[in-house]
């Protein structure tokens, strides 16, 4: 962890703390969002999702998750000890885009092989975690965009952590394009065996900077520590470790 640094909020004058590498920061006193390098106002939409669960309710969600499914040990909910419940508002860029790919390739699953052409057209609200080192299963997180509101620091719980962005808008859009192209290439390879040529065109409709409430839960079971991620906006389990004796991670 680097040394915490500060700039002054140009709106209220309060100190805004940030870590080295963070490029967008939000004042915890007035909710003003600034670009760290310049101290200037952040000009893009800054939204948030509301957390709907307190620590006691989160524990109930965790116990319910432990009881579900045949992969988990039958005594997990009864014997597991929840050791940590941390609410973190993670920063994301949500890139809304239409993507259309045209491809041509060789289909070798029949004899003789034939040349096939096809198209893939999809719409996405593509999620880019705005942190470089934080591990989070973004592809498994169904962000409930219908619940987003303008960022309001008064809605953030006193015990919660709010992480700032380490990735700017242009980098996020570039990553989204790259990842969508990779997904479309994968989908094309379900239809053909060798790609001869492929072209993807994208139309971006909006890019939103969003803070989402994620509960990072740790629990102990038979002497080992496991982690579960809970969506604070919906109560859904995003991803959780299952103790050995089950069959892995879901």
Where are the language model's segments positioned?
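Charged, low-complexity helical/coil segments in non-catalytic cytosolic or luminal regions
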Residues: 43-225, 237, 242-250
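Short cysteine-rich clusters marking metal-coordination/redox-active sites
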Residues: 9-12, 27-30
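Long, acidic/polar, low-complexity amphipathic helices and coiled-coil-like
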Residues: 17, 23-25, 62-63, 67
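A generic beta-sheet turn/junction motif
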Residues: 11, 20, 221-223
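Short Cys/His-rich "knuckle" micro-motifs
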Residues: 19-22, 37-41
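A charge-rich, low-complexity, intrinsically flexible signal that marks solvent-exposed coils, linkers
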Residues: 230-232
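Residues immediately within or flanking Cys/His clusters that coordinate Zn2+
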Residues: 4-6, 24
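Cys/His-rich microdomains that often coordinate metals
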Residues: 16, 34
């Amino acid at each position: 962890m680097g040394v915490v640094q500060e700039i002054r909020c140009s709106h209220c004058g309060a100190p805004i703390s940030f870590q080295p590498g963070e490029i967008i920061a939000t004042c915890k006193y007035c909710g003003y969002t600034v670009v760290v390098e310049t101290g200037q106002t952040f000009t893009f939409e800054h939204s948030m999702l509301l957390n709907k669960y307190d620590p006691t309710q989160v524990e109930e969600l965790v116990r319910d998750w432990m009881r579900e499914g045949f992969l988990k040990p039958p005594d997990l909910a009864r014997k597991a000890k929840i050791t940590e419940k941390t609410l973190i508002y993670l920063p994301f860029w949500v890139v809304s885009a239409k993507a259309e790919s045209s491809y041509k390739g060789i289909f070798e699953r029949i004899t003789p092989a034939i040349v096939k052409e096809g198209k893939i057209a999809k719409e996405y609200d593509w999620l880019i975690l705005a942190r470089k080192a934080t591990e989070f299963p973004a592809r498994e997180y169904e962000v409930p965009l219908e619940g987003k509101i303008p960022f309001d620091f008064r809605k953030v719980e006193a015990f919660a952590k709010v992480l700032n962005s380490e990735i700017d808008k242009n980098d996020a859009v570039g990553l989204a394009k790259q990842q969508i192209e990779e997904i479309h290439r994968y989908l094309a390879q379900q239809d053909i065996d060798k790609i001869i040529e492929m072209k993807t065109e994208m139309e971006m409709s909006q890019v939103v900077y969003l803070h989402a409430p994620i509960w990072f839960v740790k629990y102990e079971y038979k002497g080992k520590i496991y982690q579960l991620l809970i969506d604070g906006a919906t109560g859904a389990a995003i991803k959780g470790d299952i103790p050995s004796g089950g069959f892995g991670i879901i």
